[in-house]
C-alpha cells in the first residue's frame, strides 16, 4: 500500500476530486495548508522582520494499493495542472498498514 499526498491549488480541488471519484477513488482526506516552493518563496518584511510569504494550498491524502499508484498520480497530475509555477507537488510514500476503526479490519481490505 502507498500513501499519496498531493498539494494543489485551492481552485483545482473540485476538478481533482471529480476526476478521482470518476476513477473509483472516493476515500480521501482534504486539508487546507500553507506553503512555499522554490519559485513562490518570496521574502517580505514587516516592521523590520523578514519572513517568507506562504501561499494557500489544498492537501489531498489518498491511500491506494500498490498497483493503482501510477494511475492515481496521473489522474491528480492531469486534473491539477495549471501550467504555471506553484501548481503543486505529489509525494508517494510506503504505507505499512491501515485499520478501519469501526470494524477493526486492516490491510488493503480497508482501502
Model-derived features with residue positions:
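Positively charged, small/polar-rich N-terminal and surface patches that mediate targeting and assembly
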Residues: 1-111
Amino acid at each position: 500500500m502507498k500513501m499519496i499526498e498531493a498539494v494543489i491549488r485551492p481552485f483545482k480541488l473540485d476538478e481533482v476530486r471529480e476526476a478521482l471519484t470518476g476513477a473509483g477513488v472516493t476515500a480521501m482526506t482534504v486539508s487546507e495548508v500553507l506553503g512555499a516552493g522554490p519559485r513562490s518563496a518570496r521574502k517580505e518584511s514587516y516592521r523590520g522582520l523578514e519572513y517568507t510569504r506562504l501561499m494557500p494550498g489544498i492537501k489531498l491524502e489518498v491511500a491506494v494499493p500498490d498497483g493503482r499508484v501510477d494511475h492515481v498520480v496521473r489522474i491528480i497530475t492531469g486534473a491539477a495542472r495549471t501550467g504555471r509555477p506553484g501548481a503543486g507537488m505529489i509525494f508517494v510514500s510506503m504505507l505499512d498498514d491501515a485499520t478501519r476503526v469501526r470494524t477493526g479490519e486492516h490491510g488493503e481490505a480497508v482501502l
